[in-house]
């Protein structure tokens, strides 16, 4: 398989799974394990670098809202300032846990057995939460209480375990704390911006020696594909979950995790 085709496939996987509650990291790890996509130091970095394409999809889709927040922050708007502070408060737990336990998590937990197990468990939790008779109190992701932002950020830390899903953890936490489905999903998108930019910057600096001009074309392909795919997925996802909830994504997780465990048990 050529590097260009590999970059397209990984870009599609990243763009489709990054903002769905199914774990992009888990799917990329399983793609590497079972289909031999992305093996080697460069491809490990590639899967992080193309996340920037998915991030820019969110920035593009929510540009007006984000721009209004930026303007409001600098002109003294109370809600804009509280939202910016809220995103930072939600982001900080991931920074702390990443610095303290990041190396341990990567060395011990980044394996397909863990991914398959957490996909199944996460799917069961998503099914449970989706069936709860919750009474949403928060309908605007930019106006959650500050403590709610903090609790969502703490929940997001669990997603450092591959297969859990960053968006899944933050969505479940937000819903249990009183957000409606759309607001929970939207805040997971907003929280992704600093979280993924931080991961991108750290990984790029750490593995800068792996990046050469020869690789830039391949990275560009994955970047563009992940951007386009993420735009399509995010627009469809919000409409879908507002009407139908998260059941289909829960079963997606359970099926992929179960098939993965069977394949691993058979020595694949």
Swiss-Prot record:
Q: Name one GO cellular component term.
A: plasma membrane
Q: Where in the cell is it found?
A: Cell inner membrane
User: Cross-referenced Pfam families, in alphabetical order?
Assistant: BacA (PF02673)
Membrane-crossing residues? Answer: 8-28, 41-61, 83-103, 108-128, 144-164, 184-204, 218-238, 246-266
Q: What is its EC number?
A: 3.6.1.27
InterPro entries in the record, alphabetically?
Answer: UppP
Which reactions are catalysed by this chain?
di-trans,octa-cis-undecaprenyl diphosphate + H2O = di-trans,octa-cis-undecaprenyl phosphate + phosphate + H(+)
Q: List the disulfide bonds.
A: none
Task: Give GO terms for biological process.
Answer: cell wall organization; peptidoglycan biosynthetic process; peptidoglycan metabolic process; regulation of cell shape; response to antibiotic
Q: Which UniProt keywords apply?
A: Antibiotic resistance, Cell inner membrane, Cell membrane, Cell shape, Cell wall biogenesis/degradation, Hydrolase, Membrane, Peptidoglycan synthesis, Transmembrane, Transmembrane helix
- What's a single GO MF annotation on this record? undecaprenyl-diphosphatase activity
Identify its membrane topology class. Multi-pass membrane protein
What's this chain's function?
Answer: Catalyzes the dephosphorylation of undecaprenyl diphosphate (UPP). Confers resistance to bacitracin.
Which NCBIfam families does the protein's record reference?
PRK00281.1-2, PRK00281.1-4, undec_PP_bacA
The text of the family note is: Belongs to the UppP family.
Q: Which HAMAP family match?
A: Undec_diphosphatase (MF_01006)
Q: What else is known?
A: Bacitracin is thought to be involved in the inhibition of peptidoglycan synthesis by sequestering undecaprenyl diphosphate, thereby reducing the pool of lipid carrier available.
Q: What is this protein called?
A: Undecaprenyl-diphosphatase
Organism of provenance? Bradyrhizobium diazoefficiens (strain JCM 10833 / BCRC 13528 / IAM 13628 / NBRC 14792 / USDA 110)
